[in-house]
Amino acid sequence: LLEAIRPLVEAKKYEFVVFDSHKYGTVDALFEFLANVDVIMGPHGGAFYNMIFMRRGTTVIEFMPRSPSFHSTAEAVHLIFYLQASLLGDKYYSVVSGGSGSNMDVDVAVVKEILKDSLLCVCL
């Protein structure tokens, strides 16, 4: 996935960053980084809570397991990031992904289409 989307992101003149929390020694440094994020994407998990520190209108792409419990209103806790993004005015996309455990099969074409629609060209 990363190899497939990097050229698209860089062609639109955006910086492509794979987040590593160890690079930010202070909360202030982390918040400064997050305030400049245009797109956050990854598998469903607690790191998405950081979207609260991002600009309004950030694009959120969440990879959701195909498991029925993740798509049931009886298990609505899994909808928390959709709800948070909606309340913050962010653009939310859920990409249902197969696989098991920590390995997910993400549809690269779907992610590329979302990025094409979400990233504006900042070409000079």
Provide a role label for each language-model segment.
Residues 1-124:
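N-terminal targeting/anchoring "stem" of glycan-biosynthesis enzymes
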